[in-house]
Amino acid sequence: MPSQPFQDDGVVLETARPKVKPPKRYQVVLLNDDFTPMDFVVDVLTRFFGMDEAKANAVMLAVHTKGKGTCGVYSREVAEMKVMQVNQYAREHQHPLQCEMEVV
């Protein structure tokens, strides 16, 4: 491809290079509450986020001690789906566990 702009009858055409930003990423977080059992939180982390038992326990303890814990970082659509799935699963099992997403 020539480095010179294309010229024809005094008209100069230049190739526009759009500035494309990478899409935003979202972290999915679980919020602590005083009623959801710790083993249910571990179940959620293994079931919906594919964590092994050790990682799920570490995140569960972060939720318990710090008030919230990060489950993963995803595109907007994936994060929205995971939040919806976790919140629905918690309600079906009559737990007040809350899951949210935050821009990274």
From Swiss-Prot:
PANTHER family: ATP-DEPENDENT CLP PROTEASE ADAPTER PROTEIN CLPS, ATP-DEPENDENT CLP PROTEASE ADAPTER PROTEIN CLPS1, CHLOROPLASTIC. InterPro entries: ClpS, ClpS_core, Ribosomal_bL12_C/ClpS-like. Belongs to the ClpS family. NCBIfam families: PRK00033.1-5 (NF000672). This is ATP-dependent Clp protease adapter protein ClpS. Transmembrane segments: none annotated. Involved in the modulation of the specificity of the ClpAP-mediated ATP-dependent protein degradation. Pfam families: ClpS (PF02617). SUPFAM superfamilies: ClpS-like. Binds to the N-terminal domain of the chaperone ClpA.
